[in-house]
């Protein structure tokens, strides 16, 4: 008795595990895992509020994450060839609801999106994520290694999903009833890849701000650099001037939707005249631009054409130009663009941005390694198996043009010969006015797409819940509710974002903060 008492004092965690079936199951789980091509690195019980250990995470991916719920965390390597592997994590929550979800990546991948894992686990999803096959937001690992490139192009999410589902079935006696996907940016592209190439992987796919026209998006970065020039050019446009240009564009376009709220609801209905900003001799160069600079702005805000005259990529969103300045208008080629051409297109570390031409863009598109372009409109297999695709894109996105998401929607409509009402049965796309890249922005951009965009003050604004309602209950979203939050986290106002091809018009009688004063037309 005395010995037992001493042991209970010395080993409180062990005693707790002995009385906690969930923790015991987690502690014993590693012995049950025997999956082909999987090497388990760790299995650990993590209590709600506990910091997630970053000991085995690549240094460039380390982030501060606290578990939202009690969970069992599995870290592992998944071999995809004799020259490539994925770092992956599975988070298996105590409050499991019988649902599985896979998460995607961002940028040039390289990191497990642990915030997305945490978000999904919070709502009872068994969740998995990979690093896309390499460490960090860089293309250098693609040099002379096509297998690593294949992981990034299409393989990582699918392989992670296969393993994640197996782990879910091993850990929970009931297995899983439904499977989902959640991703944005590169994660959006990966979501579309899954729909197009692996239609049976998920019952519901959430794909936001998708980089699906990936190759041409990469080349667009070079086009924008060429359009705006080097930093030492006499007509170079500084970040401060881009802010002035942005303010003028918003001034000209804000009221097109009927409300003076500082937000351009749909950039397609905006046609700003940049020449209004040309200095007239009585203004200084800090609040106006030269004619040569106006010409540069017009080039930068125009469609990007390939050498054969076809549109490779649509123009930048009006309203996003100020935030684009720090990425595309710096006087240097966008880093991800330069890396892609150096390590993939030319596979030559000596290649530099000065060598880029329109023929380079043509070559990149012709290569399309492992069909990384997720632009195939034939998604009939996903439709026919009952899958649901929910897509969103911020109209203020400074990195990926939201027009590209519209173009893909139209491509699907044409390929399937389907009217919007028919596409609505399985594919719904929402433009989110005032949203930047995957979030933030000046509008009601908090739609519950992940941590930092969900608030318990409005629990109904939750993309995962919306998708579950559609897949499991047949309740398709007619609009996408979004919140504009104040600095203290309180809700300033809510807006009902329209389902494409409709767009929002302010019709009153309330002001722009009243969600019922807007009409989708």
Curated annotation (Swiss-Prot):
Gene: faeB
SS bonds (residue pairs): 26-72, 61-111, 184-438, 253-270, 279-288, 498-520
This protein's name: Feruloyl esterase B
Catalytic activity: feruloyl-polysaccharide + H2O = ferulate + polysaccharide
GO cellular component, one term: extracellular region
Function: Involved in degradation of plant cell walls. Hydrolyzes of the feruloyl-arabinose ester bond in arabinoxylans as well as the feruloyl-galactose and feruloyl-arabinose ester bonds in pectin.
Entry EC no(s): 3.1.1.73
Assembly description: Homodimer.
Organism: Aspergillus niger
Main subcellular localisation: secreted
Induction notes from the record: By caffeic acid, p-coumaric acid and to a lesser extent by ferulic acid. Repressed by simple sugars, probably via the carbon catabolite repressor protein CreA.
Keyword Chaperone appears in the UniProt entry: no
Residue positions binding Ca(2+): 254, 257, 259, 261, 263
């Amino acid at each position: 008795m005395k010995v037992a008492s001493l042991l209970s004092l010395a080993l409180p965690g062990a005693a707790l595990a002995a009385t906690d079936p969930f923790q015991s199951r987690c502690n014993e789980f590693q012995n049950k895992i025997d999956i082909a091509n999987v090497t388990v690195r760790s299995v650990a019980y993590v209590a709600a509020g506990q910091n997630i250990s970053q000991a085995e995470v690549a240094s460039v991916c380390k982030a501060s994450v606290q578990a939202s719920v009690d969970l069992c965390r599995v870290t592992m390597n998944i071999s995809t060839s004799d020259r490539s592997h994925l770092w992956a994590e599975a988070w298996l929550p105590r409050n499991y609801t019988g649902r599985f979800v896979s998460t995607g990546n961002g940028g040039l991948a390289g990191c497990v999106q642990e915030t997305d894992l945490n978000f999904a686990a919070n709502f009872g999803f068994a969740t998995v994520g990979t690093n896309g096959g390499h460490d960090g937001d860089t293309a250098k690992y693609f040099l002379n290694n096509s297998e690593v490139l294949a992981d990034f192009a299409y393989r990582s999410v699918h392989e992670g999903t296969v393993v994640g589902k197996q782990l879910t079935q091993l850990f929970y006696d009931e297995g899983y009833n439904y499977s989902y996907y959640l991703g944005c940016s590169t994660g959006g592209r990966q979501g579309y890849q899954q729909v197009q190439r692996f239609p049976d992987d998920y019952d519901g796919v959430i794909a936001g701000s998708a980089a699906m026209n990936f190759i041409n998006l990469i080349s667009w970065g070079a086009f924008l650099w060429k359009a705006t020039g080097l930093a030492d050019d006499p007509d170079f446009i500084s970040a401060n001037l881009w802010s002035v240009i942005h303010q003028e564009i918003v001034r000209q376009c804000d009221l097109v939707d009927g409300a003076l709220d500082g937000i351009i609801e749909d950039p397609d209905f905006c046609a700003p005249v940049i020449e209004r900003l040309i200095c007239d001799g009585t203004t200084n160069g800090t609040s106006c631009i030269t004619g040569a600079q106006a010409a540069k702005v017009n080039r930068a805000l125009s469609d990007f054409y390939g050498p054969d005259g076809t549109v490779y990529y649509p123009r930048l969103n009006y309203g996003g130009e100020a935030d684009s300045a720090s990425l595309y208008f710096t006087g240097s080629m966008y880093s991800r663009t330069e890396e892609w051409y150096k390590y993939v297109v030319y596979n030559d570390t000596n290649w530099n941005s000065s060598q880029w031409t329109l023929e380079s863009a043509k070559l990149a598109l012709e290569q399309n390694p492992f069909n990384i372009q997720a632009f195939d409109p034939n998604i009939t297999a996903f439709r026919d198996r009952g899958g649901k695709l929910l897509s969103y894109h911020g109209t203020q996105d400074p990195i990926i043009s939201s027009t590209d998401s519209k173009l893909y929607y139209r491509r699907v409509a044409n390929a399937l010969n389907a009217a919007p009402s028919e596409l609505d049965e399985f594919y719904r796309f929402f433009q989110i006015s005032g949203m930047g890249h995957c979030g933030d922005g000046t509008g009601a951009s908090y739609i519950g797409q992940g941590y930092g965009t969900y608030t318990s003050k409005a629990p109904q604004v939750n993309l995962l819940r919306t998708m579950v309602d559609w897949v499991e209950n047949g309740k398709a979203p007619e609009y996408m509710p979004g919140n504009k939050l104040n600095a203290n986290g309180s809700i300033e106002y809510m807006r009902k974002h329209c389902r494409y091809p409709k767009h929002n018009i302010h019709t009153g009688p309330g002001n722009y903060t009243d969600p019922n004063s807007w009409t989708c037309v």
